[in-house]
């Protein structure tokens, strides 16, 4: 057989790359179609930030650790990611924000899975980096338009429910695990007849031995119809369709559709973006609203220096599809700094959001009329929090009181009634021009005169506070 002679130096030179030579381009002019990322980097001691930024750009696009001869078979200049800016993080030693631009052609259209696999799939284990956090993404209009987004959106949900001019009220049924399907349905009925708009499966309620999913769907549907008949209002329950596989997930969604309920639920991080996008498509085609729980998010977003900020996860969900998304409360038991939370709440609801670093928004985002996702505030909230919640979130939010409903001393229905009275009192006071930040306590106390249920709730929870310093601040 003939032998092939390889001439070194003919066209390419083998060896380990200095990423800065190719992927650090401070003179680059960002294109309107580029996907932009802001990474918080903590380099290892002695590693220049330019090298780290270039390495992140390389590994999340066309690069590898060494020169390869196949580089000459394509246009690296067209397809490579570029670290185009670096800035030190104020008040932090050896931390930098690296801005990276990715050509749109690197990503499959309409695929959050591919977007995340490329940008965060492999770079977080780099030895040159002590820590890395994706703070924000700019999704360009050209890429946004390849997604269908939420199945219906905020306005379509209000039209379907015939509920306007106030926030929506929800409640997670407790105990989250251990109830039989029939007792679970009883709890749902009591909450809905008392005045709530929704009740909810907890994120880990799927199909366990004590309560199989079909039994739960049946008893909950019966509770919904009974409460609707008594109150004259449209009611719903977030039936969790999260399942071991997509075929089973579709089966549960179809059962909910057959029962005629308005909304189902999915755990989008544990279930995965591919499954979530598929379920959103099913809901859009079959007239179901889709509530999204963010179970597992804190594993990814809690640490200030490493992981992915929740604003990125929220943007990804809006692309993938969800009509509701848990967003934190600012005032309850779960993590959430006010300005940062308001920043990603706007990214979920609004169509055009300007860059505002004071709220953690690194890039201007244009959603091109993609439907909005309604934020869900839940976690350790009760009637005394209502003025702050109405003032912070406004009307286009779902306020979810689990223990704050079921913990009422008189039972579920009085607990629901207390929350409904508090919400309507605060909404009316705001509409009359009162300052809920200063007068909220007075508004609640005045409403207690007309609602013994609210008065009892106020007495029970008057001393309850969750006073811990937030970890994730600007």
UniProtKB/Swiss-Prot annotation:
The modification N-acetylproline is found at residue 2. Gene3D superfamilies: Ribulose bisphosphate carboxylase, large subunit, C-terminal domain, RuBisCO large subunit, N-terminal domain. The active site is at 174 (proton acceptor), 293 (proton acceptor). The modification N6-carboxylysine is found at residue 200. Substrate binds at residues 122, 172, 176, 294, 326, 378. It holds the Pfam family RuBisCO_large. Binds 1 Mg(2+) ion per subunit. The disulfide bond which can form in the large chain dimeric partners within the hexadecamer appears to be associated with oxidative stress and protein turnover. RuBisCO catalyzes two reactions: the carboxylation of D-ribulose 1,5-bisphosphate, the primary event in carbon dioxide fixation, as well as the oxidative fragmentation of the pentose substrate in the photorespiration process. Both reactions occur simultaneously and in competition at the same active site. Heterohexadecamer of 8 large chains and 8 small chains; disulfide-linked. The disulfide link is formed within the large subunit homodimers. Belongs to the RuBisCO large chain family. Type I subfamily. This is Ribulose bisphosphate carboxylase large chain. It comes from Oltmannsiellopsis viridis. The lineage of its organism: Eukaryota, Viridiplantae, Chlorophyta, Ulvophyceae, Oltmannsiellopsidales. The gene is rbcL.
